[in-house]
């Protein structure tokens, strides 16, 4: 793994989303609903549901909201959302991969296209940038929540089946094969670790610095994509700022 610190970016994104909490909860509700509808309402027997519930909790989503989405799926609602991805480039040639859940593909395609074109980006064809990212399980342990030193954490991560451990001043970042994600997550919890984040994500194989004169446009593009009700995740290959 490169020195790409996803946790730093996640913290910044979550802080920025505080003012948009209602929209974040709406998107999480949609994910919970679809996970419960496709795999059943019991998170113990539905790893996908358990993962999104954990994600909702890490975003401080109220328990009532989580249960409401599950009950909606249990109640036989005929609502359905399709999983769609979009690929393109942000200003400065930075690769962008977008995941959406939508009940109206035309609306979502239009929203995404407008976000790219109005903010100096270009929407590409399917497959144009996906190969530049790797699907990974991603787990974070806040260093302030454990007495274990780095060597012990590394041993526990390896025993759990994790692929890689990165260390920063405030966190341990663990990467896993996506197929082993749930197993690694559960093993670390069983070992006594409190997880600050645990999700499936897309990690860029290489990163691209955002030119100084394109930074504002780049940020506006990401914000415009995240503001879409249908967009669940926006991944970029932008290099971390020093």
Curated annotation (Swiss-Prot):
Keywords: Cytoplasm, DNA-binding, Transcription, Transcription regulation. GO terms for molecular function: DNA binding. Residues 1-22 are annotated as: Disordered. NCBIfam families: PRK00110.1, PRK12378.1, YebC/PmpR family DNA-binding transcriptional regulator. It holds the Pfam family TACO1_YebC_N. It is found in: Cytoplasm. This is Probable transcriptional regulatory protein LBA0733. GO terms for cellular component: cytosol. GO terms for biological process: regulation of DNA-templated transcription. Belongs to the TACO1 family. PANTHER family: TRANSCRIPTIONAL REGULATORY PROTEIN YEBC-RELATED, TRANSLATIONAL ACTIVATOR OF CYTOCHROME C OXIDASE 1. The lineage of its organism: Bacteria, Bacillati, Bacillota, Bacilli, Lactobacillales. InterPro entries: Integrase-like_N, TACO1_YebC-like_2nd/3rd_dom, TACO1_YebC_N, Transcrip_reg_TACO1-like, Transcrip_reg_TACO1-like_dom3, YebC-like.
């Amino acid at each position: 793994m490169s020195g790409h610190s996803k946790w730093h970016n996640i913290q910044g994104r979550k802080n920025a989303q505080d003012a948009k909490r209602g929209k974040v909860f709406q998107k999480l509700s949609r994910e919970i609903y679809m996970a419960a509808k496709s795999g059943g309402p019991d998170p113990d027997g539905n790893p996908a549901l358990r993962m999104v519930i954990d994600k909702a909790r890490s975003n401080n989503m109220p328990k009532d909201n989580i249960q409401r989405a599950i009950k909606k799926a249990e109640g036989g609602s005929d609502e359905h959302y399709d999983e769609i991805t979009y690929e393109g480039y942000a200003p400065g040639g930075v690769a962008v991969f977008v995941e959406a859940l939508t009940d109206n593909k035309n609306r979502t395609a239009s929203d995404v296209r407008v976000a790219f074109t109005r903010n100096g980006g270009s929407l590409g064809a399917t497959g144009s940038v996906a190969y530049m990212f790797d699907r990974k399980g991603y787990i974070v342990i806040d260093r302030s929540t454990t007495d274990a030193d780095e060597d012990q954490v590394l041993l526990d991560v390896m025993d759990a089946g994790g692929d890689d451990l990165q260390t920063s001043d405030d966190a341990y970042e663990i990467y896993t094969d996506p197929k082993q994600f749930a197993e690694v997550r559960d093993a670390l919890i069983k070992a006594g670790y409190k997880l600050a984040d645990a999700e499936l994500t897309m990690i860029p194989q290489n990163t691209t610095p955002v030119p100084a004169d394109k930074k504002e446009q780049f940020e506006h593009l990401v914000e415009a994509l995240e503001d879409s009700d249908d967009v669940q995740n926006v991944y970029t290959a932008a290099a971390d700022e020093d």
